[in-house]
Amino acid sequence: MVERLVFFMAENEDKLEKYGQPEKLKQTSHIRILTIIGEVEGHENLGNNSKTTKYEHVIPLLAAAEEDNDVHGLLVLINTVGGDVESGLAIAEMIASLSKPVVSLVLGGSHSIGVPLAVSADYSFIVPTGTMMIHPVRMTGLIIGVSQTFDYFKRIQDRIVSFVVSHSQIRKERLTELMLETGELTKDVGSILVGEQAVREGLINEAGGIQDAFRKLHELMKAGRD
């Protein structure tokens, strides 16, 4: 009996480490919780010392949540520095296309590609001290210094801007202005929005915490049933 209990606890901790949700909550609640933390990993593995969100874990979980009749809503908890654009946008598109209500909550930060992830929900919250960093697309590694490279950068950036504008209340011109701000970050281009600032700019729906996020999600779930 003790061995079975130890095995269950170890298995549960393993699932919590991989997916950010304990098995017990899955069995007793109609709400699925998705955590997006650290750096959104792309097609290459990051170092063992980095906290990451792996798209190969997240995308199947979202697909399973869509097909699971016991799941009535999704709560997305976000504290990310950003990461791979393609993977981040893929997750954001999956969240936005779910037929079930989704609420997001920005806890520490939702930087870079974390911005589309935060606004992909049906309703979004940010804690008063939460931050969102908006900046142009950047790339590491070998870059060929030709005009086609910069055109490619612009196309990627246009995809991000288009997604954010279509899933929030911010205007395209204002988002671009914040993205290209040069007077705020000492060694970078872009802007940092804190708490209510993100709400005033139209990126986030409301400032609040976990209680507010659950309350709103239950409201959306009830409205869907009615």
Q: What name fits each language-model region?
A:
Residues 1-115, 119-135, 139-226:
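N-terminal organellar transit peptides
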